[in-house]
Amino acid sequence: MDMTNAQRLILSNQYYLMSQMDPENAEKYQRQQLIVERGYELQIRELDKDFGSISETECREIIDFMEMYHAMQESYNMLIPECQAKVDARRLQFLGFDIATEAQQVNYVRFLTNSEGLYPQFDKADHHFNSQMPMMDKYRRMLTTWRNCPRQYHLCSTEMAQIFNA
């Protein structure tokens, strides 16, 4: 991130104000203030690590993944108990994405569930949609299989197994 001295001064002052307003996180803000004031380029890069963008196509794809899980959960609830027994209910939980390699996707899912209030039935679990392993390729394979199902919101246990195993 390239900044003029004036921009660095403004940002430094912002971090100072934040450290005063939020004593619980004061140490973090003081560290960031020091990084900006001294111009440590390597550490400055970490200040904007959460900046980024997800294209409209990527956003729609993530929503499609979440909608697929919603459809599987609803389908499961409509199954008779004998058919439900054939489905591992734990696999119906939307795990999210890997924060280490798919941070933008994790943050988008958190935005959709927290800020937008979508998919309130999804269990955030302890990791709050951090699957701790890359999931994008897996979800894409699952989505392809789900889209090939004739009744996407009335899946049978066999179709769910095919989606899980994609």
From Swiss-Prot:
InterPro entries with a match to the protein in the record: UPF0304_YfbU (IPR005587), YfbU_alpha-helical_sf (IPR023146), YfbU_helix-hairpin_sf (IPR023145)
UniProt cross-references to Pfam families, sorted A to Z: YfbU
Disulfide pattern: none
Organism from which the protein derives: Aliivibrio salmonicida (strain LFI1238)
Top-level taxon of origin: Bacteria
Family: Belongs to the UPF0304 family.
Protein name per the record: UPF0304 protein VSAL_I2183
Classification of source organism: Bacteria, Pseudomonadati, Pseudomonadota, Gammaproteobacteria, Vibrionales
